[in-house]
Amino acid sequence: MESDSEMVPFPQLPMPIENNYRACTIPYRFPSDDPKKATPNEISWINVFANSIPSFKKRAESDITVPDAPARAEKFAERYAGILEDLKKDPESHGGPPDGILLCRLREQVLRELGFRDIFKKVKDEENAKAISLFPQVVSLSDAIEDDGKRLENLVRGIFAGNIFDLGSAQLAEVFSRDGMSFLASCQNLVPRPWVIDDLENFQAKWINKSWKKAVIFVDNSGADIILGILPFARELLRRGAQVVLAANELPSINDITCTELTEILSQLKDENGQLLGVDTSKLLIANSGNDLPVIDLSRVSQELAYLSSDADLVIVEGMGRGIETNLYAQFKCDSLKIGMVKHLEVAEFLGGRLYDCVFKFNEVQS
């Protein structure tokens, strides 16, 4: 289901890719494991995906763009649950052994085969509209902070607070359907520092020197995440003279923002002079990443993104799927930042942190 045009490796990955890059962070199995027997880790993660089936089924049932949505949603739940059971019995079935990317891909495949293209569209539209109305307030609160380092920390907290809006997490989907998400309250209620990975001071030191000329940001969710988290941060980078490329999914997957949706949101936020609350956006570009999942394998990105990223000196991978469950340990030829909130207990345990802990992993490349 990826982009029809040929996919290429992300140019900031060191070559050869096969020796230097592995997308998935958490190993579900080791070479010594029996290939015919599911490992405890595989079973645990298959169960994480199984637990999300009811919330996906519920979204699919109410998709008004699909005829017979309730019956098809039931079929989705049965088919995907069947695939997960098959993988427990034989980890080599369905293109296995399973990892986070395969389990996501199989779920999307079943949804799309049944005609479900974008089951989270309604909630994405609602959350985008809410976040757009809050954008000026969030930016003016940030702009009022005079100290560069403190303003950066405030913007980073905004990214974490926005990143809570993740309907791929079964637990958060339940919280969300019960009482929604309050962005400003979330900013105040982050787990206290130090976070499970906390390189904020090192990043701040480099930030204050205005050292980056071009940043590529792999974005994550719709709503507060992109609009109140990433865009104020990107606007600050623009204000400091950097060029910014926002890399978004080509096709819908859970409540992640797509390239088309992001273009539309930016056109609503910009004024008649093309400014984002007083900041020129001529150096802000939106790129189609070529991806269609909530995780990302950077050995396969669109040619458009590869072309725009070849001279980047900062790569930011945001969100639990792209920046923690995949790519946390990815090395790049330039400086990199992985930033996201831990929203699965299994990830928290792997990292030795707490649920809803924050990851801020900065790697500086010595020139």
Swiss-Prot record:
It is an enzyme of class 3 (hydrolase). Its cofactor is Mn(2+); Ni(2+). Pfam families: ARMT1-like_dom. Changing N221A: Abolishes catalytic activity. Its EC number is 3.1.3.-. A motif (Subfamily II EGMGR motif) lies at residues 318-322. The modification N-acetylmethionine is found at M1. One of its GO terms (molecular function) is ATP binding. GO terms for biological process: coenzyme A biosynthetic process. Activity is strongly promoted by Co(2+), Ni(2+), Mg(2+), Cu(2+) and Mn(2+). Activity is inhibited by EDTA. Mn(2+) binds at D220, N221, D256. Keywords: Acetylation, Hydrolase, Manganese, Metal-binding, Nickel. Changing D256A: Abolishes catalytic activity. One of its GO terms (cellular component) is mitochondrion. Metal-dependent phosphatase with probable damage-control functions. Shows phosphatase activity against several substrates, including sugar phosphates and p-nitrophenyl phosphate(pNPP). Prefers sugar phosphate substrates, including the extremely potent glycating agents ribose-5-phosphate and erythrose-4-phosphate. Subfamily II proteins have an EGMGR motif about 50 residues from the C-terminus. This motif lies near the metal-binding residues in the putative substrate-binding cleft 2. Subfamily II proteins occur only in eukaryotes, in two forms: as a stand-alone unit in plants, and as a C-terminal domain of pantothenate kinases in plants, animals, and chytrid fungi. Belongs to the damage-control phosphatase family. Phosphopantetheine phosphatase II subfamily. This is Damage-control phosphatase At2g17340. The lineage of its organism: Eukaryota, Viridiplantae, Streptophyta, Embryophyta, Tracheophyta.
